[in-house]
Amino acid sequence: MTWEGAVAVMIGAAAVILALAAFGWWRRTRRDAALDAPVGEAPEGAVDVAEFRALYVATTVRDQPLERLAMRGLGFRSRADVTVTDAGIALDLTGKPRIFLGTSRIDAVDQATVAIDRVVEKDGLVRISWRLDDGTAVDSYLRPQDTSARSLADSIAGILTPHQTGTDA
């Protein structure tokens, strides 16, 4: 095979791989088209408890950390400002409207090590288990930037009732 032929085969293989990846993402966005992140502000009178800078990693199907959901507002990794209030958690992702998870929506908070393509040191991620408007159970993963994952998890656990804090939070 000539050098030009080898290059043509490599370009063709790369094009097929990119086409398959695009097709897979298109199918995933169609599957998750009905899922929406809860966009909105904290209720009036909510008191800020703590603020954190974090990397938003992903939202997945509950207890399936490798099954990303492609929902509007939470489909892509992003920098995030996390504001913990006495009424819930506000997520401000770069370029997206504010997402507010009220305490009644949050089922648990704990720490994790892996989500999608992110593997970190033991318990380096914060996993927030919550429910969408339609009742779908999901997990969202955050990687704190200026503090420990335990500090963020403890701050969130502090606003939840005891049965909401997860197994190790």
Task: Indicate residue ranges for each PLM-predicted region.
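Short leucine-rich amphipathic alpha-helices used at interfaces
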Residues: 77, 83-84, 127, 134
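Phosphoinositide-binding peripheral membrane targeting modules
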Residues: 80-116
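N-terminal signal-anchor transmembrane alpha helix of single-pass membrane proteins
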Residues: 1-41
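Ordered hydrophobic segments in well-structured contexts
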Residues: 56, 81, 88-90, 100-101, ...
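Acidic, Ser/Thr- and proline-rich intrinsically disordered linker/docking segments
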Residues: 27, 109-169
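Cytosolic/nucleoplasmic/matrix-facing N-terminal domains/tails
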Residues: 66, 73-74, 92, 97-99, ...
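Anionic N-terminal interaction surfaces
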Residues: 24-82
